């Protein structure tokens, strides 16, 4: 690698898995890509999100190979692994990652296959910026919930990006469980906490609030609710959160440790992941 995303030092995964990468030249972010810095790094390949397709076109015209990815579903995530594995001559690792995903997802399907509709809680996942922003049915986060044996509250919404709702809509959704993701860097909760939600008088009659079923995803690793290589851990964490009788905290912690050691080369302490 010759260049890395902006604010990489804030992301725990780099410090845990490959701290030397933090010192590479900063080429900006998905929202503010630094074309000049990228070109100056003299890359053989640039991997960009689909939203940067105009930048990719510019790089291609300059003779720099560019790969665009859009992992907004499980299928697209698997496709991304294959594309990057092929482009970087690392298909053995990509294949191992895909096989790991398929094995774990098969296990999740087996564990949840006998759940009745009544046993599947309505789950509301907030965004990193506001509890009144959630994932519509076409987002990756929605599939994470349904795969883990839940019903995404945001399925009543259309779109492929975080969608704003009002208090009335939230109250009408009346979720059984509320999930709060990490912030964008996975170092803390977002701009609000589980306590903020539980103490919000407007939400007092929401089932999840009444039952104390408001959960913060683990911080200190990665944003597991996102379509990233470790996204499978988001599904497994969700499975434990929604159905601890089917998949225990100890099982999740062991799986998280196995994943990070297998694909990143470091161990995760049991109490860090559970």
Regions found by a protein language model. Name each.
Residues 52-61, 182-197:
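A ligand-binding cleft/hinge motif common to bilobed small-molecule-binding domains
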Residues 134-135, 142-144, 149, 167-173, ...:
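A residue-level marker of the well-folded mature domains of exported/periplasmic proteins
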Residues 27-30, 35-48, 64, 166-183:
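Proline-aspartate-enriched helix->loop->beta-strand connector
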Residues 5, 141-161, 182, 213-218:
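His/Asp/Glu-enriched short active-site or ligand-binding loop at hydrolase and phosphoryl-transfer sites
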Residues 55-133, 154-156, 161-162, 209-273:
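Extracytoplasmic substrate-binding proteins
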Residues 1-41, 45-51:
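A short, structured surface patch at a secondary-structure boundary
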């Amino acid at each position: 690698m010759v260049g890395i995303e902006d604010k990489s030092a804030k992301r725990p995964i780099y410090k845990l898995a490959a701290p030397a990468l933090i010192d590479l030249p900063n080429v900006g972010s998905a929202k503010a890509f630094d074309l000049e810095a990228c070109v100056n790094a003299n890359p053989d390949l640039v991997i960009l999100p689909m939203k940067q397709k105009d930048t990719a076109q510019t790089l291609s015209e300059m003779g720099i190979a560019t790969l665009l990815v859009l992992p907004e579903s499980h299928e697209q995530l698997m496709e991304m692994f294959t594309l990057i594995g092929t482009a970087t001559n690392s298909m053995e690792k990509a294949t191992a990652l895909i096989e790991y995903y398929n094995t774990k997802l098969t296990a999740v399907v087996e564990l949840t296959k006998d759940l009745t509709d009544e046993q599947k809680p309505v789950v509301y996942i907030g965004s990193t910026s506001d509890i009144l922003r959630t994932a519509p049915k076409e987002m990756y986060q929605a599939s994470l919930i349904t795969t883990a044996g839940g019903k995404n509250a945001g399925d009543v919404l259309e779109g492929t990006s975080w969608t704003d709702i009002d208090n009335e809509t939230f109250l009408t959704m009346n979720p059984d469980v509320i999930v709060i993701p990490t912030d964008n860097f996975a170092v803390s909760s977002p701009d609000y906490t589980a306590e903020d939600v539980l103490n919000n008088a407007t939400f007092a009659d929401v089932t999840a609030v009444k039952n104390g079923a408001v959960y913060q995803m683990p911080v200190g690793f990665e944003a597991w609710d996102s379509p990233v290589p470790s996204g499978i851990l988001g599904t497994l964490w969700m499975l434990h959160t929604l159905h601890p009788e089917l998949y225990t905290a100890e099982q999740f912690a062991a799986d998280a440790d196995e994943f990070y050691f297998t694909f990143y080369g470091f161990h995760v302490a049991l109490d860090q992941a559970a």
